[in-house]
């Protein structure tokens, strides 16, 4: 075996993972080498990247253009039996169990796929705090998957690589599938499986890079809260005075737009922890959606798409230009890039002090939630566990009906412990830091229009500069929320959602409809004492 290294690091023996006969091991290659490797003319199919006019390489991820939650399984053993939030009839989630025998079969499949090949080994960190980060070793035979890892995880220095000992190993066998999936009781021939005792993730059949990113997020969501550290699906930024704010929100709520603020430096856009020192990013890069991307609307992301960025599933014309409006492969077109492609970031390490403002973003298509409410600690837990947003979906008669989405902790797909554990840890961290929480509706109101970005930015500014704390408040029934009566730069007529309706009874009817959905959704958290105690903090129909 030859070892091609761009570091002074010690040699790696892959036989310890069951991978044998490797013809060449390429460890932590430079961006220049990755560019040359992923654009080689002899590559075929999904392995081959094309160079775009912006300088970034574009690849296709095949039939999987997003994560495949139905193919996610975790080994149920003495480590996980009593700690993991397993799927159940009452609370269905993506944490489905497999036994050790199935794991052994899948591991044999992946190691066979990677054996006798030229492989890339990428060592990186998940977590910007040295005390709690995961040292992760990724093994793949596909150059662009190594590139994705280099973009998205924190890149070790040469000195750190020389002494690198992985806490977790990810073996990506994208080219292999499992013919015995029915016998194994799995969902399909593709698989993304985890073993927390062996501290390993196996991937087969899917080429989607996000399985590696979100796989490690799910693992941080297991290890950190058990140590009393908050693990959060949120963006975070920092003001000039060092004040930190975190933004939770599901897709389409404005999380990226509102946390990208010229007055504030970005800590990170998606995954963070909160420990005794403050808020820290898990990642070394960003994974941004590119559908309908334009330089005018989102200059930061557009300008980040250059050499070393990696585009996924976009349409590249024959002249190398990109059609960002084309969603024919998927609406989930993406780009990964190292975080330093964004100018206004916290340097040199993506971390800040303790958060003083915690913002939950919901796009309420029912049109009844206030544009901003200040939450009590109990309400913070309730709305964090609810993780509400809603979209407008057309029906066959052309009427637009709101479709609610409730996703625990604004990231249910990535939770590995019971949701109440994340809520408890978050509120403890908030109380210790004296942080305030706010529920911000970036959706609709009684006018039938979406709340303007100008008003929403005015609300966020009022939260961040503290002026909302000086405002008089009033009580909104049914949802049991306190709202300000006036804020600088915000239309006062929208702050009480009832004022946006010609007929206040229409608001009441819609509000009761949404409140009922909140109550029904929250029922699944009443299987423990913590959840039962929070029911009183939610909406009330009497």
Swiss-Prot record:
<keyword id="KW-0456">Lyase</keyword>
<dbReference type="InterPro" id="IPR013035">
    <property type="entry name" value="PEP_carboxykinase_C"/>
</dbReference>
<feature type="binding site">
    <location>
        <position position="456"/>
    </location>
    <ligand>
        <name>ATP</name>
    </ligand>
</feature>
<feature type="binding site">
    <location>
        <position position="214"/>
    </location>
    <ligand>
        <name>substrate</name>
    </ligand>
</feature>
<dbReference type="InterPro" id="IPR015994">
    <property type="entry name" value="PEPCK_ATP_CS"/>
</dbReference>
<dbReference type="Pfam" id="PF01293">
    <property type="entry name" value="PEPCK_ATP"/>
</dbReference>
<feature type="binding site">
    <location>
        <position position="298"/>
    </location>
    <ligand>
        <name>ATP</name>
    </ligand>
</feature>
<feature type="binding site">
    <location>
        <position position="334"/>
    </location>
    <ligand>
        <name>substrate</name>
    </ligand>
</feature>
<keyword id="KW-0312">Gluconeogenesis</keyword>
<keyword id="KW-0547">Nucleotide-binding</keyword>
<comment type="subunit">
    <text>Monomer.</text>
</comment>
<feature type="binding site">
    <location>
        <position position="208"/>
    </location>
    <ligand>
        <name>substrate</name>
    </ligand>
</feature>
<feature type="binding site">
    <location>
        <position position="233"/>
    </location>
    <ligand>
        <name>ATP</name>
    </ligand>
</feature>
<keyword id="KW-0464">Manganese</keyword>
<dbReference type="GO" id="GO:0005524">
    <property type="term" value="F:ATP binding"/>
</dbReference>
<comment type="function">
    <text>Involved in the gluconeogenesis. Catalyzes the conversion of oxaloacetate (OAA) to phosphoenolpyruvate (PEP) through direct phosphoryl transfer between the nucleoside triphosphate and OAA.</text>
</comment>
<feature type="binding site">
    <location>
        <position position="214"/>
    </location>
    <ligand>
        <name>ATP</name>
    </ligand>
</feature>
<feature type="binding site">
    <location>
        <position position="233"/>
    </location>
    <ligand>
        <name>Mn(2+)</name>
    </ligand>
</feature>
<keyword id="KW-0210">Decarboxylase</keyword>
<dbReference type="GO" id="GO:0004612">
    <property type="term" value="F:phosphoenolpyruvate carboxykinase (ATP) activity"/>
</dbReference>
<dbReference type="InterPro" id="IPR008210">
    <property type="entry name" value="PEP_carboxykinase_N"/>
</dbReference>
<feature type="binding site">
    <location>
        <position position="67"/>
    </location>
    <ligand>
        <name>substrate</name>
    </ligand>
</feature>
<feature type="binding site">
    <location>
        <position position="270"/>
    </location>
    <ligand>
        <name>Mn(2+)</name>
    </ligand>
</feature>
<feature type="binding site">
    <location>
        <position position="334"/>
    </location>
    <ligand>
        <name>ATP</name>
    </ligand>
</feature>
<keyword id="KW-0067">ATP-binding</keyword>
<protein>
    <recommendedName>
        <fullName>Phosphoenolpyruvate carboxykinase (ATP)</fullName>
        <ecNumber>4.1.1.49</ecNumber>
    </recommendedName>
</protein>
<comment type="pathway">
    <text>Carbohydrate biosynthesis; gluconeogenesis.</text>
</comment>
<dbReference type="GO" id="GO:0006094">
    <property type="term" value="P:gluconeogenesis"/>
</dbReference>
<keyword id="KW-0963">Cytoplasm</keyword>
<feature type="binding site">
    <location>
        <begin position="450"/>
        <end position="451"/>
    </location>
    <ligand>
        <name>ATP</name>
    </ligand>
</feature>
<feature type="binding site">
    <location>
        <position position="214"/>
    </location>
    <ligand>
        <name>Mn(2+)</name>
    </ligand>
</feature>
<keyword id="KW-0479">Metal-binding</keyword>
<dbReference type="GO" id="GO:0005829">
    <property type="term" value="C:cytosol"/>
</dbReference>
<feature type="binding site">
    <location>
        <begin position="249"/>
        <end position="257"/>
    </location>
    <ligand>
        <name>ATP</name>
    </ligand>
</feature>
<dbReference type="GO" id="GO:0046872">
    <property type="term" value="F:metal ion binding"/>
</dbReference>
<dbReference type="InterPro" id="IPR001272">
    <property type="entry name" value="PEP_carboxykinase_ATP"/>
</dbReference>
<comment type="similarity">
    <text>Belongs to the phosphoenolpyruvate carboxykinase (ATP) family.</text>
</comment>
């Amino acid at each position: 075996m030859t070892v091609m290294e761009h570091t002074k690091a010690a040699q790696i023996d892959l036989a310890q993972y069951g991978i044998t006969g490797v013809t060449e091991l390429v460890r932590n290659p430079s961006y220049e080498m990755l560019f040359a490797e992923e654009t080689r003319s002899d590559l075929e199919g999904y392995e081959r990247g094309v160079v775009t006019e912006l300088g970034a390489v574009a690849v296709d991820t095949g039939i999987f253009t997003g994560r495949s939650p139905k193919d996610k399984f975790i080994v149920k053993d003495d480590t996980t039996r009593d700690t993991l939030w397993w799927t159940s009839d009452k609370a269905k989630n993506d944490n489905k169990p497999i036994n050790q025998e199935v794991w052994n079969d899948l591991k044999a499949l992946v190691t066979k796929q990677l054996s006798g090949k030229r492989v890339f080994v990428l060592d990186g960190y998940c977590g910007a705090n040295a005390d709690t980060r995961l040292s992760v070793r990724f093994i793949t035979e596909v150059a662009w998957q190594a590139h994705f890892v280099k973009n998205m995880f924190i890149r070790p220095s040469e000195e750190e690589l020389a002494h690198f000992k992985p806490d977790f190993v990810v073996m990506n066998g994208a080219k292999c599938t499992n013919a015995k999936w029915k016998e194994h009781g799995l969902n399909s021939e593709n698989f993304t499986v985890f073993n927390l005792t062996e501290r390993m993730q196996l991937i087969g059949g899917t080429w989607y890079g996000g399985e590696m990113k979100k796989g490690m997020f799910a693992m941080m969501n297991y290890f950190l809260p058990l140590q009393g550290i908050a693990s959060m699906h949120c963006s975070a930024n920092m003001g000039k005075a060092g004040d930190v704010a975190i933004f939770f929100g599901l897709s389409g709520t404005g999380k990226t737009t509102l946390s990208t603020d010229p007055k504030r430096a970005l800590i990170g856009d998606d995954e963070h922890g909160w420990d005794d020192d403050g808020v820290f990013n898990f990642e070394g890069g960003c994974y941004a959606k590119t559908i309908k991307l334009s330089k005018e609307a989102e200059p930061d992301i557009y300008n980040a798409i250059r050499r070393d960025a990696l585009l996924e599933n976009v349409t590249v014309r024959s002249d190398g230009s990109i059609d960002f409006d084309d969603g024919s492969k998927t609406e989930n077109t993406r780009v990964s890039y190292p975080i330093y492609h964004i100018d206004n970031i916290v340097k040199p390490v993506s971390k800040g002090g303790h958060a003083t403002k915690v913002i939950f973003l919901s796009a309420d298509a029912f049109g009844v939630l206030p544009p901003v409410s200040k939450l009590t600690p109990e309400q913070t837990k309730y709305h964090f566990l609810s993780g509400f947003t809603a979209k407008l979906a057309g029906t066959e008669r052309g009427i637009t009906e709101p479709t609610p989405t409730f996703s625990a902790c604004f990231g249910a797909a990535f939770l590995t412990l019971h949701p109440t554990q994340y809520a408890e840890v978050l509120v403890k961290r908030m109380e210790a830091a004296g942080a305030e929480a706010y529920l911000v509706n970036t959706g609709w109101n009684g006018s039938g229009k979406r709340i303007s970005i100008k008003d929403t930015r005015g609300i966020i500014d009022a939260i961040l500069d503290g002026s909302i704390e000086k405002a008089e408040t009033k009580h909104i029934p049914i949802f049991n929320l306190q709202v300000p009566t006036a804020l600088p730069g915000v239309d006062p007529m929208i702050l009480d959602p009832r004022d946006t309706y010609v007929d206040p009874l229409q608001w009441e009817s819609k509000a009761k409809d949404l409140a009922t959905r909140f109550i029904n959704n929250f029922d699944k958290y009443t299987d423990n004492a913590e959840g039962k105690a929070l029911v009183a903090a939610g909406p009330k129909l009497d």
